[in-house]
Amino acid sequence: GVLIDDLILLAKSAQSDFITPVDTDVAELTEMVFDKSLALGERRWQLESAAFTRAMIDPTRITQAWLQLVANAVKYSSHYSTVRLGSAVRDGRLLMWVGDEGIGIAAEEIEVVRQRFKRTAGAQEMSSGTGLGLSIVETIVAAHGGRLDIRSEVGEGSVFTMTIPLEASPVPSSSETATSGDVGASPPEQSPTASKE
């Protein structure tokens, strides 16, 4: 079942070949993840930006982590609410995020949701699950030398941002550094409600 698969994946994370970084077109990956996200639920989907850069990442594992964040956003938000995702480069780091208008997480519970098999009280009431989703995301991001940032307000929604350093990645050419809709789209500096209309 799902629990066994999740535990196997976490066990594999200790292996040296857990990730296989390849030169990846981040804009293309962002658009592909966005397209796959559309099938996960009836929401107002919004692609905020796609970073026109290349990075040495494992696109399969990053897709897995990103879609886990999207699945969580769908699970903990209502039908037709907005779920947004995007990517950007800031200060030598690749940012890939998912934001929602869901139930949100109290500040004191953010560290709880980072623990394996743990979910907030509100999340437990809304749905079942293994409580391993964020552990898997954090494991994948950590294998890339990065971290998972969480910004949330109860009743307003959350923004989960995978932040990965680019120093080991190829430097984009000057023609690739421009981004589509990238200005002001990076969520780590915004509250979860910043994109609401």
Listing of model-derived features with the role each one plays in the protein:
Residues 80-92:
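Short beta-strand/loop element within the Bergerat-fold HATPase_c
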Residues 73-74:
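Short helix-loop "hinge" at the ATP-lid/N-box region of the Bergerat-fold HATPase_c
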Residues 118-128:
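Glycine-rich ATP-lid/hinge loop adjacent to the conserved G-boxes
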Residues 22, 44-54, 60:
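Conserved catalytic submotifs in the C-terminal HATPase_c
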Residues 105-117:
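Short conserved segment of the HATPase_c
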Residues 145-146:
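Conserved glycine-rich
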Residues 133, 137:
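Short alpha-helical Gxxx[C/S/T] motif in the catalytic ATP-binding
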